[in-house]
Amino acid sequence: MNDTATSPGIDAVRALERVASGSDLGEAEADALLEAMASAEIAPTLAGGMLIALRCKGECAAEIRGFANAMRRLARRPSVPAGGRYVDIVGTGGDGSGSLNLSTGAALLAAACGAAVVKHGNRSVSSRCGSADVLTALGLPLPLDEQRAGDCLAELGFTFLFAPHYHPAMKHIAPVRAALGVRTVFNILGPLANPAAPPYHVIGAFSERIAALMAETLSGMDIERAFVVHGAEGWDEATPIGPFVCFDVRRGSVTREVRDPADYGLSRC
């Protein structure tokens, strides 16, 4: 462990002072900060202080984008062909609904309909079971290593990237998050840090504010199109319960819409 407060890419103490005073970090600074935390170049107490300061200030899109880019760069890369038209269907969790894992069912259905799905996920956050729990129960041996993940996609049109396996650099950050015990930027980074960098996304968010923030973040990333949704009654899903907000994201643009299940011939429940 390096007990100094600087790394070759960032002066973490100065960055913390700026964030604590209400200033935003730039995308490159956030990228360097995440790499410094992941490599244990800054002390856990300083890393924890930074995460709390960011939450109190309110993370901006550039900061989240920098964190996501660093996570992808440090991740293990699945053996899937570059430039593929892949989609990830995922939710942030944390909506407190205690729901079934709807995003996994949607991902499997999309694959059955011909989409190439590269799903990135973990175990349960707020649902009765997380995507990894569901897929394990269905007989998929997890984690799939880089080659097996690619083979699974080629054979089935679906594969799953188990986050703890694909993000080994996060091992130094996990104890900090556990010690803090509160929501931080990492609770919304998962859907943005898929190591396969799919060009298409469907993401559910636990609040409209977070959905808008994730949409703004994605608009500056290398994507083709993404839908970020927040559902009726606070769900991180688009459901038949009622209308849902949908942020339609393309590179450089975000359009907010309110959609209703009735628009698609579905009765409310």
Q: Residue spans of the language-model regions?
A:
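Glycine-rich anion-binding loops and their surrounding alpha/beta cores
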Residues: 2-11, 18, 24-25, 73-76, ...
